[in-house]
């Protein structure tokens, strides 16, 4: 327990309502400091979120954090901006009403970042469909574009919003984001042409120069150095280390592609941006008559090209003014000062209206284009709810405050008034009206300041408008004098003339001071009339209306030139816009985020007590805390409360027929509310603690599941019974029909079977008779059956002689089919033979013609395939190859040569070429026998391998016949015969053969059979060859 208390004391309390000294401002600040020092930047005041800008990344905005807060009761987890977003979303879905989240605070307090985090939370956690993915992405990516064109670096904030933005996120009845709409307020156009020291122009200018492609910049006539442009260099901080313009350009470029900007849109848009920079670089000189001239028209040409106007027309419009006098037009030259004013007015008008066009373009891409969803055949449910996000400029106090700060601070006064009306004042008034005991809490009501600014005919804006339109020379000084005359007695207004001796030293002669709810602000009236009028000379309007730039043509319509009525002033437009905004916000349920800036230097971990106390005071946080401590967190009319939670009590469910107040009393008694947790008013129930409401809501969620389960069970039982009865009746009827159909089908089948059997018997009896009606079907059946059976018994090879025996009537057809089948098998076999195999078979045919039935061993040789050669070319001596290189070797085989004298066996190679046969001994050719000199080839009828090549005895070149023994005698003889191309040269002898040894001398080879093969010289000097007898 002590450890828990120590931890709590270290990091403070996460809800200021739990502070013991809740009336002490010091305790309030001390709690903020403790949490800030531990990087706990969020703290609650009831359901209001206080956020302190950490000026650093804390890593608390991950997807896992979003999922952690999704669907969780508000106070179950530590304070977070995601909790505010989730609570607004769940309340919207549960009650089907509209909500808004008001984010307020000084400039630099983190309002824009809070707005982005809420938008990211909705994008990630809301249910999403593929078709609505585009709408979600466009909502997200609209932010970088608007920040680029509407935000700038100021002395207090590197990303200060210089316009007000209200975004409505539209959800359908399922809670899916389907679209959105953005309203912008009072873009600070004067920043386009002038920036204070240490400040920058709008981000887009620097991003374009830093990250734009070389081709784009060349087309726009721009250089990368921002110091070259007057409109970008006045604050002397064009390049800031804390801002990465190049990376931001990539983000903006990607966003443009997501939110449906075409290349033509971007070309026109950046043409306008570049033309503003070129405008700022136009230099004027004064001629002898005191009129303005432009000596260097280089920038004029670029502007004319980018805006699609004629250079001479633009030049004239910047140095002359067109004045209409009844039916005549007079063009008067401008002085140097007025030409500079015209140039700056044109730059501001072009940028301001382009920004408005940009917002409208984004809105057109955010329009909900999803079709209606049909939940019921008789109901089209198109209900849509919205959550609004208000990210508007914070209260600003600079060393020099002008018209823009006046409008911004007036806006903050109105928002403070809204908060007072919706919280402090309205809540206390409600307690009094409902008869709830209450101790009134004092607070400052800033309505008196709002009236000072906006009251009709009497307020500062009305006085400013009068001064702008009155005839005669109206000046900023005359406006200040008019203020002193009409509102000089107001307690919150002061000028140097009206102030006391001490106050005069701090107010200049052209200044006035307003005592705002946030403190005193001194405004310089210089430029008030000019900025309120926002005058653009008619001559310049005509030029812009005729521009070929599509965006400018939409921004400057020709109808403006025809309208002679004076347009409303900037102040009046802003006042009307604020009134419209407040009407929108009042119609929605609010959530509040109060942003606090911890220091003026944008330094992390630095906590400025004085600055924070000032913000706590003017944000009214102490008053809000006191109201929350003393008040009630939730109130609802009896009818609504009973209607929502009646299912929690058996007495009120499903219908309560008595007065709603009694029903609510019965309901809370059953639930178990303690007396200190609630009060019953005249028309409403008030619940003091959020935890009481959340417990009730949890019970309601559980009850809903039970009710749904019960309703589902009853409905399913009813549907099931109805379906069962329906199916049972259908099954009985189907069964009856099916049985009848089966019976009819069985009878028909039996009749059919009788007819078939009768025909079969008749056909069988008369099967041998000529074709007639009695046997026609039988014979067709027999034919068909035979053909069908035959296909499963066809021979697979040519050698397969089997054939299915046919019936007598099909013998002729069977013979024809058999011949066709054999022919088909032969063709199939022949098509499958390769060229190499075909050549081998041809050789086998020659072998058959020579040896079949004439020599033993022929039958065994049939299964031995012939080869191209039995000797590889590498086995032949290179010298031999060189000797016969002029001839191609066709065949080679190892042989044994027997000497003609003595019959000694010697290993040799027999090589056959195209022209001759060679008997080779290693590197020497022993005998060459040309085919032309070949007389014959002899071999025995036995299985020996003796081969005798006969030559002519008269041939002096030959030594005699060659007696060889070869292991592949069939192959060798066949190859030799095919090369000689004479089959009749082979002589298969029986018993013995004579061969030529030398001129006039012959030898004899005797062939015999025995138990084993042998070759030897017998006693008679003959060569005896013994073979084992085989079947031929």
From Swiss-Prot:
Residues 578-600 are annotated as: Actin-binding. Residues 704-726, 727-756 form the IQ domain. One of its GO terms (molecular function) is actin filament binding. It comes from the Eukaryota. Residues 12-701 form the Myosin motor domain. ATP binds at residues 105-112. Keywords: Actin-binding, ATP-binding, Motor protein, Myosin, Nucleotide-binding, Phosphoprotein, Repeat. CDD domains: MYSc_Myo1. PROSITE patterns: IQ (PS50096), MYOSIN_MOTOR (PS51456), TH1 (PS51757). The keyword Transmembrane does not apply. One of its GO terms (biological process) is actin filament-based movement. The keyword Repeat applies. InterPro entries: Kinesin_motor_dom_sf (IPR036961), Myosin_head_motor_dom-like (IPR001609), Myosin_TH1 (IPR010926), MYSc_Myo1 (IPR036072), P-loop_NTPase (IPR027417). One of its GO terms (cellular component) is actin cytoskeleton. Pfam families: Myosin_head, Myosin_TH1. The modification Phosphoserine is found at residue 365. Residues 855-1029 form the TH1 domain. PANTHER family: MYOSIN (PTHR13140), UNCONVENTIONAL MYOSIN-IH (PTHR13140:SF353). It is linked to Central hypoventilation syndrome, congenital, 2, and autonomic dysfunction: An autosomal recessive form of congenital central hypoventilation syndrome, a rare disorder characterized by abnormal control of respiration in the absence of neuromuscular, lung or cardiac disease, or an identifiable brainstem lesion. CCHS2 is characterized by shallow breathing and apneic spells apparent in the neonatal period. Some patients have other features of autonomic dysfunction, including bladder dysfunction, sinus bradycardia, and temperature dysregulation. Belongs to the TRAFAC class myosin-kinesin ATPase superfamily. Myosin family. Myosins are actin-based motor molecules with ATPase activity. Unconventional myosins serve in intracellular movements. Their highly divergent tails are presumed to bind to membranous compartments, which would be moved relative to actin filaments. This is Unconventional myosin-Ih. The lineage of its organism: Eukaryota, Metazoa, Chordata, Craniata, Vertebrata.
């Amino acid at each position: 327990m002590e450890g828990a208390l120590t931890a709590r004391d270290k990091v403070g309390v996460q809800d200021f309502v739990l502070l013991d000294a809740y009336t002490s401002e010091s305790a309030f600040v001390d709690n903020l400091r403790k949490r800030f020092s531990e990087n706990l930047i969020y703290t609650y005041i009831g359901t209001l979120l206080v956020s302190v800008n950490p000026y650093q990344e804390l890593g608390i905005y991950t997807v896992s954090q979003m999922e952690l807060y999704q669907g969780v009761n508000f106070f179950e987890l530590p304070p977070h901006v995601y909790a505010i977003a989730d609570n607004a979303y769940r309340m919207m879905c549960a009650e089907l009403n509209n909500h808004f989240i008001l984010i307020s605070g000084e400039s630099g307090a983190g309002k824009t970042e809070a707005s982005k985090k809420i938008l990211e939370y909705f994008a990630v956690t809301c249910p999403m469909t593929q078709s609505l993915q585009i709408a979600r992405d466009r909502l997200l990516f609209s932010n970088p574009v608007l920040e680029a064109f509407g935000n700038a670096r100021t002395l207090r904030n590197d990303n200060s919003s210089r316009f007000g933005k209200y975004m409505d996120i539209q959800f359908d009845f399922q809670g899916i984001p389907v679209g959105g709409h953005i309203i912008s307020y009072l873009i600070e156009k004067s920043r386009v042409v002038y920036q204070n020291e240490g400040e920058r122009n709008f981000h887009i200018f620097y991003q374009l120069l830093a990250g734009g492609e070389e081709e784009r910049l060349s087309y726009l006539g721009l250089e990368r150095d921002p110091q070259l442009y007057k409109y970008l260099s006045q604050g002397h901080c064009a390049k800031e280390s804390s801002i990465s313009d190049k990376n931001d350009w990539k983000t903006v470029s990607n966003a443009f592609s997501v939110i449906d900007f075409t290349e033509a849109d971007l070309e026109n848009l950046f043409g306008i941006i570049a033309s503003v920079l070129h405008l700022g670089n136009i230099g004027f000189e004064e001629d002898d008559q005191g009129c303005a001239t432009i000596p260097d028209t280089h920038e004029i040409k670029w502007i004319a090209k980018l805006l699609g106007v004629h250079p001479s027309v633009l030049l004239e419009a910047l140095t002359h003014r067109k004045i209409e006098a009844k039916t005549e037009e007079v063009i008067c030259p401008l002085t140097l000062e007025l030409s500079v004013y015209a140039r700056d007015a044109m730059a501001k008008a072009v940028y301001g209206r382009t920004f408005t066009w940009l917002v409208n373009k984004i809105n057109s891409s955010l329009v909900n284009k999803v079709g209606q969803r049909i939940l019921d055949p008789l109901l089209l449910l198109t209900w849509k709810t919205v959550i609004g996000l208000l990210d508007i400029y914070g209260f600003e106090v600079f060393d020099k405050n002008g018209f823009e700060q006046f409008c911004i601070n007036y806006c903050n006064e109105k928002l403070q008034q809204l908060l007072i009306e919706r919280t402090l004042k309205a809540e206390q008034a409600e307690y009094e009206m409902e008869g709830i005991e209450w101790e009134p809490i004092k607070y400052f009501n800033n309505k008196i300041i709002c009236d000072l600014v906006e009251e009709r005919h009497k307020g500062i804006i009305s006085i400013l408008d009068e001064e702008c339109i009155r005839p005669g020379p109206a000046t900023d000084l005359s406006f200040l004098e008019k203020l002193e005359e009409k509102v000089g007695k107001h307690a919150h207004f002061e000028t140097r003339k009206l102030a006391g001796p001490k106050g005069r030293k701090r107010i200049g002669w052209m200044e006035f001071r307003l005592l705002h709810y946030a403190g005193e602000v001194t405004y310089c009236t210089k430029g008030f009339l000019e900025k309120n009028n926002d005058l653009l000379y008619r001559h310049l309007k005509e030029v812009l209306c005729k521009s070929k730039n599509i965006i400018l043509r939409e921004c400057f319509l020709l109808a403006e030139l025809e309208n002679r009525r004076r347009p409303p002033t900037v102040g009046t437009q802003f006042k009307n816009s604020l009134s419209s905004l407040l009407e929108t916000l009042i119609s929605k349920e609010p959530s509040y985020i109060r942003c606090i800036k911890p220091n003026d230097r944008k330094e992390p971990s630095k906590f400025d007590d004085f600055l924070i106390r000032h913000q706590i005071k003017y944000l009214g946080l102490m008053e809000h805390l006191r109201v929350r401590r003393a008040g009630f967190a939730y109130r609802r009319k009896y009818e609504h409360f009973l209607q929502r939670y009646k299912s929690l009590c058996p007495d009120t469910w499903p219908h309560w027929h008595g007065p709603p107040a009694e029903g609510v009393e019965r309901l809370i008694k059953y639930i178990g509310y303690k007396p200190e947790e609630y009060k019953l008013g005249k028309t409403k129930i008030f619940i003091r603690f959020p935890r009481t409401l959340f417990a009730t809501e949890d019970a309601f969620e559980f009850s809903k599941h039970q009710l749904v389960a019960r309703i589902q069970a009853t409905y399913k039982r009813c549907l099931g019974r109805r379906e069962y009865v329906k199916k049972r009746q259908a099954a009985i009827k189907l069964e009856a029909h099916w049985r009848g159909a089966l019976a009819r089908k069985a009878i028909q089948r039996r009749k059919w079977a009788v007819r078939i059997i009768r025909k079969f018997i008749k056909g069988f009896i008369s099967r041998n008779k000529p074709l007639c009606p009695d046997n026609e079907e039988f014979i067709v059946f027999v034919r068909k059956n035979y053909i069908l059976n035959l296909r499963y018994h066809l021979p697979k090879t040519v050698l397969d002689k089997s054939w299915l025996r046919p019936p007598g009537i099909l013998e002729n057809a069977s013979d024809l089919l058999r011949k066709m089948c054999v022919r088909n098998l032969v063709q199939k076999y022949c098509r499958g033979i390769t060229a190499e195999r075909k050549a081998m078979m041809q050789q086998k045919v020659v072998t058959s013609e020579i040896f079949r039935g004439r020599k033993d061993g022929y039958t065994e040789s049939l299964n031995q395939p012939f080869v191209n050669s039995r000797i590889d070319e590498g086995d032949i001596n290179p010298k031999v190859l060189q000797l016969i290189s002029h001839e191609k070797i066709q065949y080679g085989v190892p042989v044994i040569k027997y000497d003609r004298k003595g019959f000694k066996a010697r290993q040799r190679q027999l090589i056959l070429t195209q022209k001759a046969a060679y008997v080779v001994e290693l590197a020497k050719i022993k005998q060459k026998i040309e085919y032309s000199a070949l007389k014959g080839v002899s071999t025995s009828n036995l299985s020996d391998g003796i081969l005798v090549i006969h030559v002519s005895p008269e041939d002096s070149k030959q030594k005699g016949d060659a007696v060889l023994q070869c292991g592949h005698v069939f192959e060798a003889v066949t190859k030799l015969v095919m090369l000689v191309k004479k089959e009749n040269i082979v002589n298969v002898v029986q018993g013995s053969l004579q061969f030529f040894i030398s001129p006039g001398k012959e030898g004899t080879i005797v062939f015999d059979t025995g138990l084993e093969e042998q070759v030897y010289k017998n006693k008679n000097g003959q060569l005896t060859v013994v073979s084992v007898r085989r079947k031929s």
